[in-house]
Amino acid sequence: MSVAVLAFGLNHTSAPVSVRERVSMPVDLVKPALEGLRATFGGAVREAAILSTCNRTELYCAAEGQVAEHLPAWLAEHNRLEAAALRPHLYRHQHDDAVRHAFRVASGLDSMVLGEPQILGQMKDAVRAANEAGALGTLLHQLFQRTFSVAKEVRSQTAIGAHSVSMAAAAVRLAERVFGQLEDARTLFIGAGEMIELCATHFAAQRPRSMVVANRTIERAETLAGRFSAQTMKLADLTERLAEFDVIVSCTASSLPILGLGMVERATRQRRHRPMVMIDLAVPRDIEPEVGRLDDVYLYSVDDLGRLVQSGTDARRAAVVQAEAIIETRVQGFMHWMQSREVVPVIRDLHQAADDVRAAELERARRMLARGESPEAVLEQLAHGLTQKYLHGPLAALNRSEGDERRQLLAWVPRLFPGRDSRR
């Protein structure tokens, strides 16, 4: 049975953060998810990889049969959701559409921030996790290697990454909307990953009054804080110290909210209702959405920042056209490679059949020589036997055919035996 490439999932355009956070998969859960997927579908899912970020959860797989029809139910069951509630937010791509989607994602064309570079690293992490789980094979390995190559080509030959308004820069803009200049702002960063590092870089450029990094692992917090002359604190101290901060930016891998309504409500009272800007870049969310109902709190989710960064995409629209052209060419190249793989078993069988004929005729020739027959007669018989057996299949097919089938076979004769036309 033939194997197809599938890309399946949801992203920031098809699902709000309230849905995305429910199917988000931390790195440590990707391996068991892949194992569960392959156990569910058996050999029908040959290869698989899961890409899960703040803005998307996608499954890439090499699969056979009707697997694609059952993936929504699997994803819903895996995350303990109702399939009917999840299905409207899902998309599915197959064959060349799946390849095109992978190329566009890695190139930043499908990102909330058009042209953002982080997605390429996230996709490489996803491939590494799939490989460590033993879920990658020749097909997806080749797909992702070409995906990374295409992304590099797009970035080097177009301006897709230029004029980018990043999520980190958008976070600064949102804080400035409330406080104006940030010189007097006390800023807290919760987490110590790449996104927090980017945000800290942008906020540090505004020279806020203070910057503090809180993280579950204090050593990582100290490493990040050292870059910006910031202080550190333990997550356990958030309850006591939250009221100190004017701006809170959070992005952790926690599966449960870190800042709840009660904690923030107490902090606003301690602040005597001075405003707080809270920017939640995590999926699943670090801050309970109910916090946004408090009068003195300006809560922004990753989707809110996404709407802000869209204003910076106009200057890159021309680059998108160039990028799409590059991607289309590379998609066709990959599909040609896939089709050539389908021919390989046929070519192998043809070679084996020809070798079997050759071996049989050689053995016959050796027996004739052993009986003392003349070499000339043996060579004549060998050539005749090879010719008859090699042509038996094509001639039998021609004799059995009729109508359009015969015309098609006759049209192929000059291509299969290219010297034929010149002898007419």
From Swiss-Prot:
Belongs to the glutamyl-tRNA reductase family. InterPro entries: 4pyrrol_synth_GluRdtase, 4pyrrol_synth_GluRdtase_dimer, 4pyrrol_synth_GluRdtase_N, GluRdtase_CS, GluRdtase_dimer_dom_sf, GluRdtase_N_sf, NAD(P)-bd_dom_sf, Shikm_DH/Glu-tRNA_Rdtase. GO terms for molecular function: glutamyl-tRNA reductase activity; NADP binding. Homodimer. CDD domains: NAD_bind_Glutamyl_tRNA_reduct. Catalyzes the NADPH-dependent reduction of glutamyl-tRNA(Glu) to glutamate 1-semialdehyde (GSA). The active site is at C54. During catalysis, the active site Cys acts as a nucleophile attacking the alpha-carbonyl group of tRNA-bound glutamate with the formation of a thioester intermediate between enzyme and glutamate, and the concomitant release of tRNA(Glu). The thioester intermediate is finally reduced by direct hydride transfer from NADPH, to form the product GSA. It holds the Pfam family GlutR_N. One of its GO terms (biological process) is protoporphyrinogen IX biosynthetic process from glutamate. This is Glutamyl-tRNA reductase. Gene3D superfamilies: Glutamyl-tRNA reductase, N-terminal domain, NAD(P)-binding Rossmann-like Domain. Its EC number is 1.2.1.70. SUPFAM superfamilies: Glutamyl tRNA-reductase catalytic, N-terminal domain, Glutamyl tRNA-reductase dimerization domain, NAD(P)-binding Rossmann-fold domains. It catalyses: (S)-4-amino-5-oxopentanoate + tRNA(Glu) + NADP(+) = L-glutamyl-tRNA(Glu) + NADPH + H(+).
